[in-house]
């Protein structure tokens, strides 16, 4: 190939697009408004759009296949308007939002795909420039025609030296080409920033969760006061608890009616505290206006159904990981074996396991109170008359519980 023409100064006869402004050290997506203004002020960079099957368009066809809906492939026997639209979209290829669809590569005049190494180029020239710098190939390039080749999309692969010189001439920056280590570091930084944005977005979404309304705050206040007034020893249970002697309840010694064995001494201690514990649960329920509005028959059914559950919850939230004990009724600290041999059997394992799980949540009095109210208002108890009403009450406590958790997390 021979050079087609020369300029007056003896430079190659390619069009000379102006390089990017000196004040812009690197093209970035965040500054595209200024970049677009600069680009539009240089009409000599524009040219007619020519549809050719470039590697970019070929890649876009492959990408489009993976985005077809079921309707797109349901009938392949006859063409449709949607099929023509899909085919037309394939031919256009990917165009960044900041780039005009008819923007041309400043090196070869092919269809540009974006800003690469500080210039508007196609994928081919971007890859050529990157490989040349990364592998230090330019010293080995040589031109057969004294460095005067015209570089366009047809001839660009025929002379590497002239193509590289034009890349430099139009302003492509060698310092922006990263080696393997820098490229891996950049990729790692991108992943870290993406993860950071994901966490921030998650925190923002959590921050928008609703908190209690004024009406719910009134309900929360009533339930919390009812719990505090009927919870033995309150928040001072650790200071006031007494440990059951170690020699009590270590081994079952008497056969129980169900076929198991019970330590009578431990059983005697437990029966002494069970009656006041039940009384406190009843008092808690009576302090809730919603409960008092229910028929007496429903009140009895609800209390029979939830009494053991609420007492177990109150014991579970007083689990001490250090001593591995539960404090019953706010006064008696017992081990798992003592509770099991004292008559509770396998139920003791469930209560201890619940206590171990709840200990990591650090529940406050309000959360425990609302959980008790939810257990109390269980509409699935057999024999209830006001099922829908009780279910509505439970939903109110559940919603208040959720909103209070949001409030506590954000405060």
UniProtKB/Swiss-Prot annotation:
GO terms for biological process: cell differentiation; negative regulation of transcription by RNA polymerase II; positive regulation of transcription by RNA polymerase II; retinoic acid receptor signaling pathway; thyroid hormone receptor signaling pathway. Its main location: nucleus. A zinc finger (NR C4-type) spans 105-125, 143-167. Residues 242-411 are annotated as: Interaction with NR2F6. 3,3',5-triiodo-L-thyronine binds at residues 280, 329. Residues 105-179 bind DNA. Residues 1-104 are annotated as: Modulating. L-thyroxine binds at residues 280, 329. Residues 15-24 have a biased composition (Basic and acidic residues). Belongs to the nuclear hormone receptor family. NR1 subfamily. Nuclear hormone receptor that can act as a repressor or activator of transcription. High affinity receptor for thyroid hormones, including triiodothyronine and thyroxine. This is Thyroid hormone receptor beta. The gene is THRB.
